[in-house]
Amino acid sequence: MKFSRSVGFVLLLLSVGVAPACSQGEPPATQVSSAVPADLQTGEAKFKANCSACHGVAGIGTSHGPPLVHKIYEPNHHGDAAFQRAAANGVKAHHWEFGNMPKIEGVTPDDVDQIIKYVRWLQHEAGVF
C-alpha cells in the first residue's frame, strides 16, 4: 500500500511537471485578443449583425456554422470573391456538416468587402495566414 502511494505521488509530480512543458509551443487559440483597429470596426459591426449568429463572435464558429478563422478560409483557398458569392447566392455545404448557407438579404457588396477585411484581420491575428 505504501509503495503504490509513493508511486502514485511520483507519477502525480511528473505529470504536473510535464504538462506545462507539453503545452509550450502549441498554437494559440483561434480567438483574437487584440483590439479591433478603428478602420475595421464597421466591418466588425456588420459581421456581428449579419454573420455572427452562425459563424460565432470573432468568427470562431457555432453549432450552426463553421469557423471562418480557420485554415480552410485562408485567402489562398477561399478568396474574397468566394465570400462575395456566398453572401449574394448562398453556398451549398461542402466542407462542413452544418447544412447549406442561405444568401444574406440586405447586405451590399460594399458591406461584404468591409466584413471580409475584418475576417481577414481576425484570421491574420490568429495565425491562419
Show which residues each predicted segment covers:
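Conserved Rossmann-like nucleotide-binding pocket used by diverse enzymes
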Residues: 18, 47, 69
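Cys/His-rich metal-chelating microdomains
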Residues: 25, 57-58
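Post-cleavage N-terminal segment of exported redox proteins
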Residues: 1-38, 86, 118-129
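The canonical Cys-X-X-Cys-His
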Residues: 43, 48-57, 115-119
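Gly/Gly-Pro-rich "capping" loops immediately C-terminal to redox-active cysteine motifs
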Residues: 33-34, 38-40, 44, 60-88, ...
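Axial heme c-ligation environment in periplasmic c-type cytochrome domains
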Residues: 62-71, 89-116, 122, 127-129
